[in-house]
Every structure is written in C-alpha cells, then in structure tokens.
From Swiss-Prot:
Belongs to the heat shock protein 70 family. PANTHER family: HEAT SHOCK PROTEIN 70KDA. Gene3D superfamilies: 1.20.1270.10, 3.30.420.40, Actin, Chain A, domain 4, Substrate Binding Domain Of DNAk, Chain A, domain 1. Residues 573-617 are annotated as: Disordered. Pfam families: HSP70 (PF00012). The modification Phosphothreonine is found at T174. Transmembrane segments: none annotated. This is Chaperone protein DnaK. One of its GO terms (molecular function) is ATP binding.
C-alpha cells in the first residue's frame, strides 16, 4: 500500500507529514515553511494558496481565511472570482495545494490521507471535511481528532509506559481538551470536550476591537466599516499577539490607516491579558467538564500536553498550570504535533507502524426526537467508537401510517436546543393502536465519527437506513462536480504558470538578443544582423498582443535567427583569433620570425619548431 499522508487542516495554518522509517516527518511547502497559511486568494482568475495568498491579503479583497470556522454550515457561501463557493470547496483548494507539494517531495502520486478535525466537531463538520478531501482528489482513510493526533505524536516513543494525559489544544479557531490513557500501545480517549468557536482569531479580535474603539474616541472615525483598514488591523493584531508571547510590549504602527490619520500604539502584555481574560477563563469550563466525564482528578494526570499555536500565549500557559497544578510538557512542537500524529495513524493503517491501537470517542450525545419535543439519547457522549446502539420505540397515535425520525446531536434535554443531523421517514406501518407497532431505531458511528441511522418495523421487517446527510451537506453529484472543477482549476493554474514561464523566457530572449546586436556593432554587416532584428521586432509585437501560440512561434523564430548569427560570429572569430596570435600586421610575418613574405606581400608558409616544455627546465 502506498504512503498515507497526515494532514492537519487548521483554521490559521495547515501542515502535512509522512512516516519515514520509524518517525513521522513534516513536509515543507514550496516556500520552505513547515506550516502553510490556510488562506486562499483569487487574482486575475488564478487561485493562490498559502504564503502568497496571505502576503497580498491587505490589497486583495478576494482573500479568504479561517474558512474552517464555517465547515458544516449549510447556508454559508463565499463570493469571489465571480462565483459562490462553499466552505468545503475553499478547504479543498488548501488540501489540493498540500497534496501537490507532498507529491513533489515524495516523488509519487498521493491518493490517501488521514485528516484531523477538532474533537468537538459535530457530524456535519466531519462530513464536510471528508467531502473537502474528496474534492481535492484524496481518499480520506480516516478522520481523527486533533488532540488524539497530538497524543499519538507525544506517545509514539513511550508505548511501554502507562500514563494518563491531558491534551489542551487551542488553535487558531477551535479549542479542544481530551483526556487519554496510554498503556501497552493502546491510546484510549477517556473523554473530550471543547468549543469550536474559541481560538487565536478571538484573541486577535480583542486587539482589533480595542484599536477600533480607541481610534474612534480620538478621531471620531469608525474603522470597523472599512474592510481594507480591518485587514491591516488584523495583520497588526496578530503580530502584536505573537510579539507579546516573548516580549512585555508590542508596538502597533499603522500609517495612514484612514486618509492622513495614523495609529501608533503600545500594547503591553498586561493590557493584552486584561483584554483577553474572558477568553482564557472560557477555556477552563471544557477542561473541568472533560475531567468530570473521565472520572478523574487532576492528581491522576501524569502529563499535560499543549497543542496549537495559541498555547504560546503566556496567560494561557499560566491558566493551564494553575488549573491542573502541573507544569505543561513542551516536548512537542504545538504547530506540528497534529500533522505528525495524523501521519502515525496513516502508518498504522498501512501496517508500517505496529502495536499501536487508537480508541477514540464521539464528542456529543446522539439521539432522536420523541413525543413532546424531547431528545431521547441512544449514544452518550464520550462513547468509544466505532459503536452501535439500538432502541425500540412505538407510534404516538392510533393507526399512524408512518414515523418521522428526527436525528439529533447534543446534550440539551429538548430537541429544539440540539443540532439536527437529519430527518427520514419509515412508511407503510400497518394500522394499529398507538403503542403497538415496534419500531427499532439503530445508530452506528464509524471510525471517522460519521453517523448512520436505521429504523425497522419489527412487525413487517420493513426498514429504512440513511447515512446522515444534512440538507445543506453535499450530494455525491455535487461532490463529483466539484472534483471536476478542482481538476480544471489545477489545469488552469498549470496553464497560467506555463504562460508566466513563457513570458519570462521571452523577456530574457529579448534582452539577450538586443545585447548581442549591440555587442556585434560593425563586426558583421547589416545583412547579417537584419534577420535577428526583424525576428526581434516580431517577437515584441507578439508579446504585446499576448497570443500564446504566436508568442511561441515568434520566440522560436528569434532563437533560430540568433543561433545563425552566433554561428557567423564564431566563424569570423576563428581567422581573427588565429591572426591575433601573430605579432605583425595582418598579412605580414612578425619581426624576428622565420616566416617568409612573398613579393606580393602575402604571407607564405613559414618554418616553426615545437617547443617541449621540458626543454625550458
């Protein structure tokens, strides 16, 4: 089986790794980065991904970032490039870029991947991630939770050690905490909790809000309505946040943020901590809930692992230390651990890594709506997956011909307060008094955490089964169409690059040809130089017209003409260089030479003696 790459599809940054020998290795991107910004931009019809997209975000309004926060939102669309894109499509562009540079590194086609998701992602978000992989041309072998992947990266070389681990994962847009037990190569998740809308972006937003409010007070101008100003503020807020992880203050300088007005502020670490205190506090709840669900106290925890770039914030580290009573373990890179863990899981699937078993859990309870709008749970949160569970229900009215199955995910007692995963109907139930029909509802969760539900009339044997497909989720036809679109975009991008390369070659050829003509001067006649000059003029015209085929044709013509000119120069240089080796005027023997000159002044053969270098010693 070919290699399975591990991808951390992050809110702010993404990373990819592969197993090499006994250890996972991060694959660097074309810019040399170990992580790639999860940013997509559209420029003149071209799709840009990663560093190049992020660099021009300030000047390009068609730049999309943090799309992960909208995965699974059925009605969310991004307008760009004259089209509307779903979050899955934008994510697929990031995955496609990662797939390409992984292939360049490995020197082979990559078909399979393990992709990570926040532990607290619901079914719709997981399915959307899997769809994004499919659109990008990847067979998603497994969806695994980010904290679990980080634990794999941490524990791969500690398989013989029994320990309980708390993984605190605060990324760019999501927060997870998982409690795991490691022993004899088994990584068992005991519980998980989190917040899919808490991350580094929220810390940035606090700084942005502070700057906007302060600027409005001082100048009476509201920058929150200026998209260009907001992008500049976002960039500076992120830089200030990173600076404050190692320094006590950060300078924020934004000249001409509005007309001739500037921002010149100093943000201290103490101010930043005050601005973001509620976010740090908000992260404590999921930690406490996860510990409670695992049935453990903090004294039972052997290691606290920090994962995600936002765990570099000193106030976050202090909060974790205060809450758990333990010094966090910094042995793994918080930006890379998840991708490394995903690569390990890929190697477990291929059989390249043995003696490792991963037992993950479902993050949220699953059930159906029953009489009175109540949610009746069939599978409780933190149940080890894969799993299945069945329960028998009945009709709510006499002679009821059909049963509507409303599938829910969440922890609230009332159906309306939970997440709807889907609806389906079991029909043709024979007429019978209320409570008599026996309807067996079965839930099945696979290793990816994706849910299937079936309902069966035990009296007739009639059944109905669905893999949860929200109305907003992608159908197979839609996915196939997007796969084709992605492939055509790849072809268009390839064509665009070829055009750019051609233009660069043309510019170089024009420059070198003009230089050659200038250097030739009077060494050759106009008749020799004319074919090159004519071909050069033709190529310049073709360059202005931007007709690719004509440009190729004229480029080839100039190259041939320039080559012919070079041959003539070489031929002329031959006799000249031979003559230059003599010390007299052309046509005469040099002084003291043994050459003889005829009466007509022409040079005739002269005697010469070969000098042996040894004779000079």
């Amino acid at each position: 089986m070919s290699k399975i790459i591990g991808i951390d599809l992050g809110t702010t940054n993404s990373a990819v790794a592969v197993m090499e020998g006994s250890q996972p290795k991060i694959i660097t991107n074309p810019d040399g980065g170990r992580t790639t910004p999860s940013v997509v931009a559209f420029k003149n019809g071209e799709i840009q991904v990663g560093d190049v997209a992020k660099r021009q975000a300030i000047v390009n309004p068609e730049t999309i970032s943090s799309i992960k926060r909208h995965m699974g939102e059925s009605n969310y669309r991004v307008k760009a490039n004259g089209k509307e894109y779903r979050p899955e499509e934008i994510s697929a562009m990031i995955l496609q870029y990662i797939k390409k540079y992984a292939e360049d590194y490995l020197g082979e086609t990559v078909n399979d991947a393990v992709i990570t998701v926040p532990a607290y992602f619901n079914d719709a978000q997981r399915q959307a991630t899997k769809d994004a992989g499919k659109i990008a041309g990847l067979n998603v072998q497994r969806i695994i939770n980010e904290p679990t992947a980080a634990a794999l990266a941490f524990g791969l070389d500690k398989l013989d050690k029994d320990q309980k681990i708390l993984v605190y994962d605060l990324g760019g847009g999501t927060f997870d905490v998982s409690i795991l037990e490691l022993g004899d190569g088994v990584f068992e998740v005991l519980s998980t909790n989190g917040d899919t809308h808490l991350g580094g972006d929220d810390f940035d937003q606090k700084v942005i809000d502070w700057l906007v409010e302060d600027f409005k007070k001082e100048n009476g101008v509201d920058l929150s309505t200026d998209s260009l100003a907001l992008q500049r503020l976002k960039d500076e807020a992120e830089k200030a946040k990173k600076t404050l992880s190692s320094a006590n203050e950060a300078q924020i300088l934004l000249p001409f943020i509005h007309q001739n007005l500037n921002i010149d502020k100093t943000l201290t670490r103490a101010q930043f901590n005050q601005l973001t205190a509620d976010l740090v506090e908000r992260a404590k709840g999921p930690v406490q809930n996860a510990m409670k669900d695992a049935g453990l106290s903090f004294s039972d925890i052997n290691e606290v692992i920090l994962n995600g770039g936002s765990t570099r914030i000193p106030a976050v580290q202090d909060s974790v230390k205060e809450l758990t009573g333990k010094e966090p373990n910094h042995s793994i890179n918080p930006d890379e651990a998840v991708a490394l863990g995903a690569a390990i899981q890929g190697a477990v699937i291929t059989g390249d890594v043995k003696d490792v078993v991963l037992l993950d859990v479902t993050p949220l309870s699953l059930g159906i709506e029953t009489m009175g709008g109540v949610m009746t749970k069939l599978i409780d949160r933190n149940t080890t997956i894969p799993t299945s569970k069945s329960q028998v229900f009945s009709t709510a009215a006499n002679n009821q011909p059909a049963v509507d199955i409303h599938v829910l995910q969440g922890e609230r007692p009332m159906a309306a307060d939970n997440k709807t995963l889907g609806n389906f109907q079991l029909t043709d139930i024979p007429a019978a008094p209320r409570g008599v029909p026996q309807i067996e509802v079965s839930f099945d969760i696979d290793r990816n955490g994706i849910v299937s539900v079936s309902a069966k009339d035990k009296g007739t044997g009639k059944s109905q089964k669905i893999t949860i497909q929200n109305p907003g989720n992608l159908s197979e036809d839609e996915i196939n169409k997007m796969v084709k679109d992605a492939e055509s975009n790849e072809e268009a991008d390839k064509k665009k690059k070829e055009e750019v390369d051609l233009h660069n070659q043309v510019d170089q050829l024009i420059f070198s040809s003009e230089k050659t003509l200038s250097d030739v001067g009077d060494k050759l006649g106009d008749s020799d130089k004319k074919p090159v000059q004519d071909a050069l003029d033709e190529l310049k015209k073709a360059k202005d017209s931007n007709n690719i085929e004509t440009l190729k044709e004229k480029k080839d013509a100039l190259e041939k003409a320039a080559q012919a000119l070079a041959v003539k120069l070489y031929q002329q240089a031959g006799p000249q260089s031979g003559a230059a080796g003599q010390t007299g005027k052309a046509g005469q023997a040099g002084p003291n030479s043994d050459g003889k000159t005829g009466d007509d002044g022409k040079t005739v053969d002269g005697d010469f003696k070969e000098v042996n270098p040894d004779d000079k010693k």
